[in-house]
Amino acid sequence: MGRFLLVTLSMLVVTFSLNEANSCCCPQDWLPKNGFCYKVFNDLKNWNDAEMFCRKFKPGCHLASIHSNADSADLAEYISDYLKSDGHVWIGLNDPRKQRTWVWSDRSSTNYLAWNQGEPNNSKNIEYCVHLWALTGYLKWNDTPCEALYHFICQCKF
């Protein structure tokens, strides 16, 4: 019985230590996930201004990149909890060469895509930036003009 209790307590200590390691370096109100910290901002900015805002935190910060269904679900829940008003949210995916080749602003792999049905459609030939669509609970993406004013989510390593 004593050994079982010792092993159980040891496992709890390790579990709490790992949880703390995941969140120890993120500022308050930032979401720790996969070695990054994420923060949604209620300000309205165009895509370029939002990306520059994120970069000013520290080198290596960008609009968020999303690489799995699990990441998408966690970010959607976080945004729903912390965004003070309804509206779309910029992410780091864009088409800087205007050739329908989507890249993340942090240059990470585009190994995961979550377009809403019928997207990307490049309506009026002017949609080169991507936002999380509020109407889908922030789970699906839409291409839109980069000049649109939306909330945004930054991704940083602290």
UniProtKB/Swiss-Prot annotation:
User: Native species of this protein?
Assistant: Notechis scutatus scutatus (Mainland tiger snake)
Summed up, the tissue specificity of this protein is: Expressed by the venom gland.
Q: Which residues cross the membrane?
A: none
Q: What GO CC terms are in its UniProt record?
A: extracellular region
Gene Ontology terms, MF aspect: carbohydrate binding; metal ion binding
Spell out where the chain is glycosylated: 121
What is the protein's name according to its record?
Answer: C-type lectin mannose-binding isoform
Q: How does it assemble?
A: Homodimer; disulfide-linked.
**Do the record's keywords include Glycoprotein?**
yes
Extract the InterPro entries matched here: C-type_lectin-like, C-type_lectin-like/link_sf, C-type_lectin/snaclec_domain, C-type_lectin_CS, CTDL_fold
Instruction: Report the PANTHER family cross-referenced here.
Output: MANNOSE, PHOSPHOLIPASE, LECTIN RECEPTOR RELATED (PTHR22803)
Q: What is its main location?
A: secreted
Protein task: Mannose-binding lectin that binds to and agglutinates erythrocytes in a calcium-dependent manner.
Q: Which family does it belong to?
A: Belongs to the true venom lectin family.
Subcellular location, record wording: Secreted
Positions with a binding annotation for Ca(2+):
127, 142-143
The disulfide bridges present are 26-37, 54-154, 129-146
Short motif (Mannose-binding): ranges: 119-121
Q: Which domain of life is it from?
A: Eukaryota
Q: Where is the signal peptide?
A: 1-20
C-type lectin domain residues are 33-155
- Give UniProt keywords alphabetically: Calcium, Disulfide bond, Glycoprotein, Hemagglutinin, Lectin, Metal-binding, Secreted, Signal
